[in-house]
């Protein structure tokens, strides 16, 4: 049987705040490698995206004021390394995401593939 005396008890918001502090203090800046599987631009300008690998997904956001510093535009199917901070949000549903500061193409092969795809697209339009 579980001994309730030694188990901490929290209010929901109290637990969410504790969770936020643990996550955000232990994962200050991180680099996450994954494929972009979804991209949405909000009316206020921020970009919401989803990164995935074989087993998991992670939400990410690029705030409007940081978009001008990006070297590449996020596109579905692009394999990237996103650098940023892990943050939590618990207004209606507790979630965590990466607040992205920088995006890099993951590997030389992915970069060459991107260049080749763009070249073909421009050739179809007779611009290359």
What are these regions (language model features)?
Residues 1-128:
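Acidic, two-metal ion nucleic-acid-processing modules in DNA metabolism proteins
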